[in-house]
């Protein structure tokens, strides 16, 4: 299984390069047309099972109707028996794939930040505690529900960099992953943030007791 984003796209190239036989790749979201054309020619060593629609639909009605289509239901069922699920973790900044591809506007991002969003997983925006930011976008998003992520096997999150620290922290706090792949500096920064959050909570509890 693969989620939307640049990092899953690069992983697809990596796997296709090193696989002796074709691999089956199942998309979890719509919008794959935005990044699959950028993959290398060796991607054809993969059997692609794609959800053939945009990531964000024009209305919730269209999204719900598309989910009833046999082809999309078949892909959704395949995803439940896949061995691995690879997802990117997006930050809330103008370099995010979802905004570089003009799916969301800078104004959309400003609004999400005002609502407390620090990142996204499978294009669901979440706050620092891993809770869903419920917006109109949610009703038009072709992506598994956050509550369904636990149904997938071996969910691997791949992300790194200073602009992803809060997003990674939020995803880990929400317990959406089985495995996180990142670099040492990012891992250290996420641990520092965790310790900082715990220290703040401890001081508040001590103050309350006094």
Where do the PLM segments sit?
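Helix-turn-helix/homeodomain-like alpha-helical modules used for DNA recognition
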Residues: 1-17
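N-terminal phosphate-binding or glycine-rich loops at protein starts, especially the Walker A/P-loop
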Residues: 4-7, 23, 182
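Flexible loop/hinge segments that line or gate small-molecule binding clefts
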Residues: 3, 26, 30-33
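Conserved phosphate- and dinucleotide-binding cores of soluble alpha/beta proteins
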Residues: 17-18, 31-200, 208-210
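A short alpha->loop->secondary-structure connector
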Residues: 16-25
